[in-house]
Amino acid sequence: DEDVVAQVPPSAKHFNVLLHTLDRMKAERPGRLIQNITRLAEHFKRRSIVALISDLYENPEDLLEALKPYNYLGNDVVVFHVLDPAEIDFPYREPSRFVDLESGEDVPVVPEGFAKQYRELVQAHIEALRTRCTEARIDYVLLNTARPLDEALFSYLGNRERLARVR
């Protein structure tokens, strides 16, 4: 969204509130992810786990630059990159019209000759995000929308807890 539309105070007791808040979110207007990330950094006064959940249609360098202050403040940052399987695989074979959920723009697409290039660009973007996050010591998790978000979050937190015990 263009602005921060909801904020849940940090607390282990607020996890269910966080999940319900996320469940109610709808893509309604164009987003300004980088500006909102930058603006929210000042609200983190104590060490926290900062989870960014987004489709990440942003420049990887700009995104990582916006996330740097969170690391500097001692936060553990995890980026959940949420994509629909069709956004990754582009399974379409017939000419189609796509509607951008944020802008409402109608985009005609002829898949022939476009699908291969599209898949390559998406994979390159995913890999750039993964690489930049790893370099910045930020956890990167690619999430498929076919998997429930709460299940993915619990799985990540469980893996994180197991790794902490090993260290």
Regions found by a protein language model. Name each.
Residues 1-167:
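Exposed, interaction-prone extracellular/peripheral surfaces
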